[in-house]
Structure formats: C-alpha cells, structure tokens
C-alpha cells in the first residue's frame, strides 16, 4: 500500500505571516512547499513565455494541467522555479499581475490548477500556503492551521515592509484596503476565507514570528507524532 504524504495547510488573510511561517516549517521539517498564491502568476508568466493567449481558456487549460513549477525555501527565502528557471522576481511584475487576474477568471483553468496543486502532495510531506488549502484543496489534511491577526496589526506590518523598500505609505489607507479585502474574501460565494472546522486558529497579533513558528511546529509535531 502506497503511503499518502501528510499535508500541513496554512490558511489566513493577507499580512498574517503565512509565507514566513510556511518557509520556516518547510525548512524545519524538510518538506515540500506550495505557495498557492503564486500559482496564477506562474501560469500567467508561462503563458507569456510560450506566447499562449491569456484570454483563451482553451489554450490555457493544457498549460495549467502540466505547469512545471517548484517552490524552494532556502534560508528563509522562497525561490519560484518555472521550467528550471528562477522566476521569483519576474512573477512580481505588473504585466504578470495583470495577466494573472485574467487567467484566474476561467473556471476550467481554476479546476486544472486545483488538480495541479494537489499533485504537490509528495513524501515526506507538504506545507501548503493559501486561503482555501484546508477547506478546498486539501480537506483531508491531518494538520490545518488558520493564521490570523488583527487588521490593524496586519496594516502596521505592511507599512513597515513598504517603508523598508523606501515607499511612502499612509496607514489609514492601508488599513482601509486590508479591511475591504478581508470583507471581499470572507463573503465571496466560492471558497470564502474561513477556517476549516478542524483547524487550529492561531492569532499572531501579539506574537513574534519566532513564537508563531514555535507554536505551529509544536502543534504539527503533536498531531503527526513527529520527533
């Protein structure tokens, strides 16, 4: 009988710290990593590379089904590898972002990418970062964590990130954008942003990232009986 690889899902709103936590857990456990938020950008970039029309659902479905992408976390940095090439920076361009929003609108593309995401489930295990990993993509995952934080704290973290990059930011505007996105995500008809019924809800508002990582790893190891 073939062993089924365990999955740890990390869901939650934007700015809660999911990416940092997932990278740390993948490195600590030496497991595979899936950044579901980057998948649509990677597909959009692949379409641009192969001159596939991003407005054609029929053309995009086979590309989505066989998307050659890997996520590698090294020393806290996430590398996105498309067809053997590091495209971590390239997927963050505005051109790719615009194309990604187009490809994400097609139901058959979303279905193909759902199957592609599930194919990341390989031994020794998978850390899956997203918004509906525990509810839609891996509903049978043995460990589910919903990482949350207050909208004010998430706006504060985002402001610090932008300031470090030299950007001038308005806290009130950031907070309003986060609240608007939260409302949209939590009330959408398909795959709303809600914790799975069997998820550990971990509030990181008053915790350091080190404390969040420690709590998440401790919970996962207990659930999976890992040493």
Curated annotation (Swiss-Prot):
| Biological processes, Gene Ontology terms | nucleobase-containing small molecule interconversion; pyrimidine nucleotide metabolic process
Give each disulfide bond as a residue pair. Answer: none
Any idea which GO molecular function terms this record carries?
A: ATP binding; CMP kinase activity; dCMP kinase activity
* Record-listed E.C. numbers: 2.7.4.25
Q: Where is it predominantly found?
A: cytoplasm
Q: For binding ATP, which residues are annotated in this chain's numbering?
A: 12-20
The family database entries (InterPro entries) matched by this protein are listed as: Cytidylate_kin, Cytidylate_kinase_dom, P-loop_NTPase
Q: Which reaction does it catalyse?
A: CMP + ATP = CDP + ADP; dCMP + ATP = dCDP + ADP
Question: What's the domain of life for this entry?
Answer: Bacteria
Q: Which GO terms describe its cellular component?
A: cytosol
Q: Which CDD domains match?
A: CMPK
Which keywords does UniProt give here?
ATP-binding, Cytoplasm, Kinase, Nucleotide-binding, Transferase
Supply the SUPFAM superfamilies for this chain.
P-loop containing nucleoside triphosphate hydrolases
Record flagged with keyword ATP-binding:
yes
Q: Hey, which family's this protein in?
A: Belongs to the cytidylate kinase family. Type 1 subfamily.
State the protein's name.
Answer: Cytidylate kinase
Provenance organism: Shigella dysenteriae serotype 1 (strain Sd197)
């Amino acid at each position: 009988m073939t062993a089924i690889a365990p999955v740890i899902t990390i869901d939650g709103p934007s700015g809660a710290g999911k990416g940092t936590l997932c990278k740390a857990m993948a490195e600590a456990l030496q497991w595979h990593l899936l950044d579901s938020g980057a998948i649509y950008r990677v597909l959009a970039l692949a379409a641009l590379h192969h001159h596939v029309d991003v407005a054609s659902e029929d053309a995009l479905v086979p590309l989505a089904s066989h998307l050659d992408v890997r996520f590698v976390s090294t020393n806290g940095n996430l590398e996105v590898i498309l067809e053997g090439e590091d495209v971590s920076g390239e997927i963050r361009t505005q051109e790719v972002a615009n194309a990604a929003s187009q490809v994400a609108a097609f139901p058959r593309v979303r279905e193909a990418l759902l199957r592609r995401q599930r194919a990341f489930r390989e031994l020794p295990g998978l850390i899956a970062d997203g918004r509906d990993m525990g509810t839609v993509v891996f509903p049978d995952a043995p460990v589910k964590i919903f990482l949350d934080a207050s909208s004010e704290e998430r706006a504060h973290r985002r402001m610090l990130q932008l300031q470090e990059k030299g950007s001038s930011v308005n806290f009130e505007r950031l907070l309003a954008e986060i609240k608007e996105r939260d409302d949209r995500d939590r009330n959408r008809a398909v795959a709303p942003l809600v914790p799975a019924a069997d998820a550990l809800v971990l509030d990181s508002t008053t915790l350091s990232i080190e404390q969040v990582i420690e709590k998440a790893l401790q919970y996962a190891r207990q659930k999976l009986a890992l040493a």
